[in-house]
Regions:
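Exposed, flexible binding/inhibitory loops of compact, secreted disulfide-stabilized domains
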Residues: 25-165
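Bacterial Sec-dependent N-terminal signal peptides
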Residues: 1-33
Length: 165
């Protein structure tokens, strides 16, 4: 009878561990969901060739129109349906941006933007399409409601590449 009792205790312990793991997973998911920040992705801009032209990657966090305009210009094309910032929107928004430069074109896919006690974390995936004939400056431009923050972490393809404080 004793081996059955031990077996029952082992089974009970395994069940308890599984329940705890499931609870923990849902708790982490709810916390991440709660910390998400609403954001908007903007397009229809080119990067000024005077803005940090020698750097392979640049980062911008601003709510000042003058700084934004020093980095970006409006790219007009026929049939344009770009999502540009509305005039005056930087009075109530912050722009978070990264710019990749090189002989490739970039496709960005934003995974999430979260706020953990003032530490913003921008997670995105980047796919490069190589070019043998041209150099590109590819911006990812995001706006969020104006909030207090301590730092912004840029996490590209799962790796921390910059922590701006």
């Amino acid at each position: 009878m004793l081996p059955i009792h031990r077996s029952f205790n082992t089974l009970s312990l395994l069940t308890l561990i599984n329940v705890m793991l499931i609870t923990f997973c849902f708790s982490v998911e709810k916390t991440a969901e709660k910390n998400k920040i609403d954001f908007e992705i903007h397009s229809g801009y080119f990067v000024s060739n005077k803005f940090e032209p020698k750097k392979p990657q640049s980062f911008i966090i601003t709510n000042e129109q003058k700084i934004f305009d020093s980095a970006f210009g409006i790219a007009f094309v026929q049939g344009d349906d770009s999502n540009r910032l509305k005039e005056g929107s930087l009075k109530s928004k912050i722009v978070i941006s990264t710019i990749k430069r090189g002989s490739f074109f970039c496709d960005y896919d934003v995974v999430s933007l979260t706020n953990n006690k003032g530490e913003l974390e921008l997670r995105y995936n980047l796919k490069k399409r190589e070019s043998s004939t041209a150099e590109y400056s590819c911006p990812l431009i995001i706006s969020i409601p104006k909030i207090d923050y301590k730092s912004v972490k840029f996490i590209e393809n799962g790796k921390l590449i910059k922590n701006l404080k």
